[in-house]
């Protein structure tokens, strides 16, 4: 039906007769001529109709936005004064001699001339996806997956599918359950990841596996989360953590070159402890120059319990955050930031405004200055590198509260004061995570997942001091986003059972939930390691959007609903009966 795409026409096509198919993006009737911008997935080209071609001109007068049409015409070069530098096809136009209206469009529920609500965009997603910027994002996503497949094939990885209907295993979030008709009362689970299957593939001898795979998690959604998402899933045998990182870093560096024409350079490597200490985050945005600086040793003897308490507590921390140019902040802005850090458990936000450092106490403005002598103030200014016009904010509390609060404040200030270099790319690896964390109920939970191996520990040593264990895990972070994470896996049964025991999973439960894995570990399991990238998040970064729904063709809302298809929906009672399921309605208060 077509000979060319609209968006690919250029001066090399001048004089050629072409047939185009697409949609009317805009129509302009000048009386003697009718112009339309015609759009397809590759872009937009200007088409015009002349009264001398009476049939085509008459039909063109009926055109409205989003009519689906076919035109045949001749490509012409535009006069220099009419060249549109803002269009890829702006040097040419098409003189249409034939027009076919393939399908008319009713008045549109979306207005291309204004910002539509996200609810409307999701309800009429098929119209929203016609917008060039949305089409471009999905084309970029397709380019990413195509590149990944070529790279993995070239590096000896096998694309192997794993089951979508599997067994529920504890991986941190709730499972989506699928009832079995054949085995009434039993349920499959949709996979939160192919984690155990890819480990079993290594035990099967496949050595290098990858898969671009859907995963499912029934969890409370955030703006950057979806109930179903896509991973680039990778697993290898007989490779160390540094070797896995080397191959995966090569993949991402070459991907950025291919898609963006940008060389990310060699990725720095930072431990979890250093990232938390310097940036208050295990996924630091290195485009932001601000760092947290420990000052507890300077404040142990001050007569100010807010500082002295955490400074003398082994579990406490006092840290300072220097904000270049921050002295310009108003009292209201400071109060707003004080309320902001309370979200993360902080009780407030002490500060020092540095007006003229050379004047000592007389050159600063601070509500806590009365508790500090000139020597302490100068030591703080020296350690933080403060200059005239800077602001220093303080966090004083439990270590985690200080890291979370000042880490979040650092990001917010970086954005609010334009301190973060938005034009920069800042990748890194974060390694050496704690293996376990407090579960809030007196026990421990796995910081990553229960199949991650500890670093340089025997099973006996791990059992004796699990709180000291460092996971042989690694996360790839770009511009403050965790784009991928992985680890060396446990490949010995004794170690796996020890980890399960530390997590409070007794032997009976281990056999019930993971018997197949424990059995497989008895038969010559190779050392193996892997990683998974979030395809959605990679696409967000490479397309410059901060909304994950912009890079998924048919996403869900934050309430895990599809406004277009109205999923989820009530099931047919007959289908439920076949599954042995009865919907129990909540009793009203008066009937209780």
Swiss-Prot record:
<feature type="binding site">
    <location>
        <position position="489"/>
    </location>
    <ligand>
        <name>L-aspartate</name>
    </ligand>
</feature>
<dbReference type="Pfam" id="PF01336">
    <property type="entry name" value="tRNA_anti-codon"/>
</dbReference>
<dbReference type="InterPro" id="IPR029351">
    <property type="entry name" value="GAD_dom"/>
</dbReference>
<feature type="binding site">
    <location>
        <begin position="534"/>
        <end position="537"/>
    </location>
    <ligand>
        <name>ATP</name>
    </ligand>
</feature>
<dbReference type="InterPro" id="IPR045864">
    <property type="entry name" value="aa-tRNA-synth_II/BPL/LPL"/>
</dbReference>
<protein>
    <recommendedName>
        <fullName>Aspartate--tRNA ligase</fullName>
        <ecNumber>6.1.1.12</ecNumber>
    </recommendedName>
</protein>
<dbReference type="Pfam" id="PF02938">
    <property type="entry name" value="GAD"/>
</dbReference>
<dbReference type="GO" id="GO:0006422">
    <property type="term" value="P:aspartyl-tRNA aminoacylation"/>
</dbReference>
<feature type="binding site">
    <location>
        <position position="482"/>
    </location>
    <ligand>
        <name>ATP</name>
    </ligand>
</feature>
<comment type="function">
    <text>Catalyzes the attachment of L-aspartate to tRNA(Asp) in a two-step reaction: L-aspartate is first activated by ATP to form Asp-AMP and then transferred to the acceptor end of tRNA(Asp).</text>
</comment>
<feature type="binding site">
    <location>
        <begin position="217"/>
        <end position="219"/>
    </location>
    <ligand>
        <name>ATP</name>
    </ligand>
</feature>
<dbReference type="InterPro" id="IPR002312">
    <property type="entry name" value="Asp/Asn-tRNA-synth_IIb"/>
</dbReference>
<dbReference type="InterPro" id="IPR004524">
    <property type="entry name" value="Asp-tRNA-ligase_1"/>
</dbReference>
<keyword id="KW-0436">Ligase</keyword>
<dbReference type="InterPro" id="IPR004365">
    <property type="entry name" value="NA-bd_OB_tRNA"/>
</dbReference>
<comment type="similarity">
    <text>Belongs to the class-II aminoacyl-tRNA synthetase family. Type 1 subfamily.</text>
</comment>
<feature type="binding site">
    <location>
        <position position="448"/>
    </location>
    <ligand>
        <name>L-aspartate</name>
    </ligand>
</feature>
<dbReference type="InterPro" id="IPR004115">
    <property type="entry name" value="GAD-like_sf"/>
</dbReference>
<dbReference type="Pfam" id="PF00152">
    <property type="entry name" value="tRNA-synt_2"/>
</dbReference>
<keyword id="KW-0030">Aminoacyl-tRNA synthetase</keyword>
<dbReference type="InterPro" id="IPR047090">
    <property type="entry name" value="AspRS_core"/>
</dbReference>
<dbReference type="InterPro" id="IPR006195">
    <property type="entry name" value="aa-tRNA-synth_II"/>
</dbReference>
<keyword id="KW-0648">Protein biosynthesis</keyword>
<dbReference type="GO" id="GO:0003676">
    <property type="term" value="F:nucleic acid binding"/>
</dbReference>
<feature type="binding site">
    <location>
        <position position="226"/>
    </location>
    <ligand>
        <name>ATP</name>
    </ligand>
</feature>
<keyword id="KW-0067">ATP-binding</keyword>
<dbReference type="GO" id="GO:0005524">
    <property type="term" value="F:ATP binding"/>
</dbReference>
<dbReference type="InterPro" id="IPR047089">
    <property type="entry name" value="Asp-tRNA-ligase_1_N"/>
</dbReference>
<dbReference type="InterPro" id="IPR012340">
    <property type="entry name" value="NA-bd_OB-fold"/>
</dbReference>
<feature type="region of interest" description="Aspartate">
    <location>
        <begin position="195"/>
        <end position="198"/>
    </location>
</feature>
<feature type="binding site">
    <location>
        <position position="217"/>
    </location>
    <ligand>
        <name>L-aspartate</name>
    </ligand>
</feature>
<keyword id="KW-0547">Nucleotide-binding</keyword>
<keyword id="KW-0963">Cytoplasm</keyword>
<dbReference type="InterPro" id="IPR004364">
    <property type="entry name" value="Aa-tRNA-synt_II"/>
</dbReference>
<comment type="subunit">
    <text>Homodimer.</text>
</comment>
<feature type="binding site">
    <location>
        <position position="171"/>
    </location>
    <ligand>
        <name>L-aspartate</name>
    </ligand>
</feature>
<dbReference type="GO" id="GO:0004815">
    <property type="term" value="F:aspartate-tRNA ligase activity"/>
</dbReference>
<dbReference type="GO" id="GO:0005737">
    <property type="term" value="C:cytoplasm"/>
</dbReference>
């Amino acid at each position: 039906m077509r000979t060319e795409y609209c968006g690919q026409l250029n001066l090399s096509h001048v004089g050629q007769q072409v047939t185009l198919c697409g949609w009317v993006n805009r129509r302009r009737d000048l009386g003697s001529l009718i112009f339309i911008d015609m759009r397809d997935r590759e872009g937009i080209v200007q088409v015009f109709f002349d009264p001398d071609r009476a049939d085509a001109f008459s039909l063109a007068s009926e055109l409205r936005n989003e009519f689906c049409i076919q035109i045949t015409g001749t490509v012409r070069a535009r006069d220099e004064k009419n060249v549109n530098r803002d269009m890829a096809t702006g040097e040419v136009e098409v003189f249409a001699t034939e027009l076919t209206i393939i399908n008319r469009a009713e008045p549109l529920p979306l207005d291309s001339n204004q910002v539509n609500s996200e609810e409307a965009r999701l309800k009429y997603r098929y119209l929203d996806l016609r917008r060039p910027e949305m089409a471009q994002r999905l084309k970029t996503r397709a380019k990413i997956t195509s590149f990944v497949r070529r790279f993995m094939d070239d590096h000896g990885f096998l694309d192997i599918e794993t089951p979508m209907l599997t067994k529920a295993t504890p991986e941190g979030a709730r499972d989506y359950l699928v009832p079995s008709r054949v085995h009434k009362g039993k349920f499959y689970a949709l996979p939160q990841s192919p984690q155990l299957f890819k480990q079993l593939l290594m035990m099967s001898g496949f050595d290098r596996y990858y898969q671009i795979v859907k995963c499912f998690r029934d969890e409370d959604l955030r703006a950057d989360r979806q109930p179903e998402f896509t991973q680039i899933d990778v697993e290898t045998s007989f490779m160390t953590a540094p070797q896995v990182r080397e191959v995966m870093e090569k993949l991402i560096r070459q991907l950025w070159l291919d898609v963006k024409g940008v060389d990310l350079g060699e990725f720095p490597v930072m431990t979890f402890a250093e990232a938390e200490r310097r940036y208050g985050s295990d996924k630091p945005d290195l485009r932001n120059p601000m760092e947290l600086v420990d000052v507890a040793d300077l404040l142990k003897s001050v007569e100010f319990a807010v500082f002295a308490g955490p400074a003398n507590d082994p579990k406490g921390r006092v840290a300072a955050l220097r904000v270049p140019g921050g002295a310009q902040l108003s009292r209201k802005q400071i109060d707003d930031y004080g309320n902001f850090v309370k979200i993360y458990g902080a009780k407030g936000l002490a500060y020092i405004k540095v007006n003229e450092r050379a004047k000592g106490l007389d050159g600063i403005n601070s509500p806590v200055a009365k508790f500090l002598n000139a020597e302490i103030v100068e030591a703080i200014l020296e350690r933080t590198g403060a200059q005239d016009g800077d602001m220093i904010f303080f966090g004083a509390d439990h270590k985690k509260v200080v890291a979370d609060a000042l880490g979040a404040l650092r990001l917010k200030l970086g954005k609010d004061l334009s301190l973060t270099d938005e034009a920069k790319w800042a990748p890194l690896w974060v390694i050496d995570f704690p293996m376990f964390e407090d579960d809030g109920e007196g026990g421990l939970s796995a910081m990553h997942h229960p199949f991650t191996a500890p670093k340089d520990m025997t099973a006996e040593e791990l059992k004796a001091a699990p709180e000291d264990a460092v996971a042989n895990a690694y996360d790839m972070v770009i511009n403050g986003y965790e784009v991928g994470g992985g680890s060396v896996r446990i490949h010995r049964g004794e170690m796996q059972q020890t980890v399960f025991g530390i997590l409070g999973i007794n032997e009976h439960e281990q056999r019930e939930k993971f018997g197949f894995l424990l059995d497989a570990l008895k038969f010559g399991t190779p050392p193996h390691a892997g990683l998974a990238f979030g395809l959605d998040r990679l696409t967000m970064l490479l397309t410059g959007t901060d909304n994950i729904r912009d890079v998924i063709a048919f996403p869900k809302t934050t309430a895990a609903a599809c406004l277009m298809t109205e999923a989820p929906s009530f099931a047919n009672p007959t289908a439920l009966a076949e599954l042995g399921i009865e919907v129990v309605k909540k009793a009203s208060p008066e009937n209780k």
